[in-house]
């Protein structure tokens, strides 16, 4: 919300519609009367709607109002959890210990709430045998099915086999799909 509102002497309209500090309508008053009312209450006269005729002004503590607005904005930013996509790169002929390390790494990403993009890179003639890459990616998906579900099935994209695993279980995915289907019906 923009905090560049006109307050007190910055308001130039000759007559304004005034709202009291507790929200009651005080009617249309001259700017001098409205400023006197605000001064008596030891508060500010703030123009909240300048495009109406006459402009709407509210008697309030402007400093407290500004503080509340910035606090709400900060809280809403904190509440938003941004899901990042982390990538784990594999090769079709990866050794078991290296594979287990990659599974642990992907598991840590998913447990933190991030999506994991599993990509199996083919080099040279490895592309002639894409089934080896499919086996590795399927093993990775099976190793992570207790903490995440496959959001996009493995598909070949150039020289890479790519799959995305999202946090949650298959049950949560089915619930989300069910709710989404009900929303589309309505």
Swiss-Prot record:
InterPro entries linked to this entry: T_IF-3_C_sf (IPR036788), T_IF-3_N_sf (IPR036787), Translation_initiation_fac3_CS (IPR019813), Translation_initiation_fac_3 (IPR001288), Translation_initiation_fac_3_C (IPR019815), Translation_initiation_fac_3_N (IPR019814)
One protein family per Pfam: IF3_N
Subcellular location: Cytoplasm
GO terms under biological process: ribosome disassembly
GO function terms (MF aspect): ribosome binding; translation initiation factor activity
SUPFAM superfamilies reported in the protein's UniProt record: Translation initiation factor IF3, C-terminal domain, Translation initiation factor IF3, N-terminal domain
Gene3D superfamilies per record: Translation initiation factor 3 (IF-3), C-terminal domain, Translation initiation factor 3 (IF-3), N-terminal domain
Keywords in alphabetical order: Cytoplasm, Initiation factor, Protein biosynthesis
Major subcellular site: cytoplasm
Any GO CC annotation of this UniProt entry: membrane
Function: IF-3 binds to the 30S ribosomal subunit and shifts the equilibrium between 70S ribosomes and their 50S and 30S subunits in favor of the free subunits, thus enhancing the availability of 30S subunits on which protein synthesis initiation begins.
The protein's assembly and partners: Monomer.
HAMAP family the UniProt entry points to: IF_3
Record-stated family: Belongs to the IF-3 family.
UniProt name for this protein: Translation initiation factor IF-3
């Amino acid at each position: 919300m923009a905090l560049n509102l006109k307050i007190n002497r910055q308001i130039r309209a000759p007559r304004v519609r005034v709202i009291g500090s507790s929200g009651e309508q005080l009617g249309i008053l001259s700017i001098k009367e409205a400023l006197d009312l605000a001064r008596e209450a030891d508060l500010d006269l703030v123009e909240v709607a300048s495009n109406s005729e006459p402009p709407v002004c509210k008697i309030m503590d402007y400093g407290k109002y500004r503080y509340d607005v910035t606090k709400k904005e900060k809280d809403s930013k904190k509440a938003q959890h941004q899901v990042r996509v982390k990538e784990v790169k594999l090769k079709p002929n990866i050794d078991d210990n290296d594979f287990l390390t990659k599974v642990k790494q992907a598991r840590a990403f998913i447990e933190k709430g991030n999506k994991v993009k599993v990509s199996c890179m083919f080099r040279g003639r490895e592309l002639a045998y894409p089934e080896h890459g499919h086996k590795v990616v399927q093993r990775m998906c099976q190793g992570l099915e207790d903490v995440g579900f496959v959001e996009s099935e493995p598909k070949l994209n150039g020289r890479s086999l790519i799959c995305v695993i999202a946090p949650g279980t298959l049950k949560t995915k089915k619930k989300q799909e069910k709710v989404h289907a009900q929303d589309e019906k309505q």
